[in-house]
Amino acid sequence: MANPQTTRVAVVGAGISGVLAAGHLLATGLEVTVFERNAAPGGVWYAIPFSGLLATREADAWARLYDERTPIEPSYPAMKPSKADPPATNEQETSRFMLQHAPPGPCYYNLQNNVPTPLLEVSLKPWPDGTPDTVRHDVIQRFIQDMSIEAKVHDVTRYEARVKKVVKDGAEWKITWSTPQVGLQSETSEFEQVSPFDVVIVASGHYHAPRVPDIPGLSDTKRKYGSRILHSKEYRRPENFRNKNILMIGGGVSSIDIANDISPFANTIYQSTRNSKFDLVESMLPENGVRVHEISHFEIQSHSDEPLSDDEPLPLTIHFESGQNLHGIHMIMLCTGYHITFPYLEEYHSDETTLQDADENILITDGTQVHNLYQDIFYIPDPTLVFVGLPYYTFTFSIFDFQAIVVAQVLSGTVQLPTETEMRSEYNAKVERVGLGKVFHSILGTEENYVHDLLTWVNTSRAAQELVAIKGFSPRWYEAKEALRQKYRAQVNK
């Protein structure tokens, strides 16, 4: 298949996937513009803008190196994926406007990487010598921001630029984007612009739109007791859970990490799971953590409108599918993940279509996967729409780096895309092999195979042009993966 005719490339997002994509593209000589709705790079690791971060690097102000604000609360249950990013209203109160224009991410006070730094290696920048396996969020943010500066991505990034709409108009893409404008009376509005591009790379991540399950009674409980129920994206500090009994819904990474973070302050932490294949083992919970069954429904026991005192538990019975129930809970935290959503690509969403009924043009149905991509990267009907950063349950930085390398090789003309028929055949084979939904973008345990397939394709073209082959994972990466595997095995056998 003929490669996209590429001169102008837009990258949506300046988290790790966007910085990697833009950096590799710039290295090939392409014209790149990055749109980032925050004031600096970093994505989920974003804390404070460049000026503040650079000014405090030698100071002891690390305690404020994250966004203390909490995002606007999600709907209970969650909105449809295509509506997961409601538009800001012009001339509204500034702080709320900015919460919508550039919502705070899930970064919290004690957030650290849960994958060792050697497994987060990228080709654009090595980790500094002596970097520990585990570091605070501000260290990772600094790493991404330094990479952005060194790779010249910072120079081509439009900050505080929210992408509102991306549409194909003939042979080019039109991106509608806005920046905030503060008026004389401190009211905030948007200045909107439209810019044309040949290729759009979606690198906006999938930790934006909270997935709130439709458990019977949960919406009523939230409506009545408000701040006692929150999504993990809203979590900031463990001290807020002092002497409380906490119910956490979900058994994945965020649930385990936050449970361990609040453990020194909380009384008992109950973790409700559905025994998903992606749940982490119970032994990873802290000593005051207890795993319980899947929730059947919530039952409010009091209809009084009197506010609860801070140390008073919710007048609530939590019923489990096992027939058991639970009382005495002070707070409920939903660690239930996120919708995959691209609200600026609304015409490619089809909220009412089932996974199985998605046609060959739809990108998003129920928010659990992106349809119709070749190698989780190229939109098969139109490869001028590209995605970097979709795989999960993996070692994100390294995988996204290889994706970005492939994109740069294709868009620069070094590597040819397969025909549309060949890409469609590969996609259909993957659907048959792994299934639809959440599992589709998981490459848990198969990272090496995924990267091998990408590099076999790329290096075949490079060899034909007598170009040096692109190398895969380093020996250090393999050593770190084996060490992590042994550590997890020991945890399972506890």
Curated annotation (Swiss-Prot):
Region (Disordered): 73-93
Transmembrane segments: none
Binding site for NADP(+): 250-255
Entry's EC annotation: 1.8.-.-
Binding residue positions for FAD: 13-18
Disruption phenotype: Impairs the production of ustiloxin B but accumulates intermediates such as ustiloxin F and C.
Single Gene Ontology MF annotation: N,N-dimethylaniline monooxygenase activity
UniProt key word Oxidoreductase: yes
Residues of the signal peptide: 1-21
A Pfam family reported for this protein in Swiss-Prot or TrEMBL: FMO-like
Superkingdom to which the source organism belongs: Eukaryota
Enzyme class: oxidoreductase
Record-linked Gene3D superfamilies: FAD/NAD(P)-binding domain (3.50.50.60)
Keywords: FAD, Flavoprotein, Glycoprotein, Monooxygenase, NADP, Oxidoreductase, Signal
Biological or metabolic pathway of the protein: Mycotoxin biosynthesis
InterPro entries: FAD/NAD-bd_sf (IPR036188), Flavin_mOase (IPR000960), Flavin_mOase-like (IPR020946), FMO-like (IPR050346)
Glycosylation sites: 459
Similarity annotation: Belongs to the FMO family.
Function: Flavin-containing monooxygenase; part of the gene cluster that mediates the biosynthesis of the secondary metabolite ustiloxin B, an antimitotic tetrapeptide. First, ustA is processed by the subtilisin-like endoprotease Kex2 that is outside the ustiloxin B gene cluster, at the C-terminal side of Arg-Lys, after transfer to Golgi apparatus through the endoplasmic reticulum (ER). Cleavage by KEX2 generates 16 peptides YAIG-I to YAIG-XVI.
Protein name as catalogued: Flavin-containing monooxygenase ustF2
Organism: Aspergillus flavus (strain ATCC 200026 / FGSC A1120 / IAM 13836 / NRRL 3357 / JCM 12722 / SRRC 167)
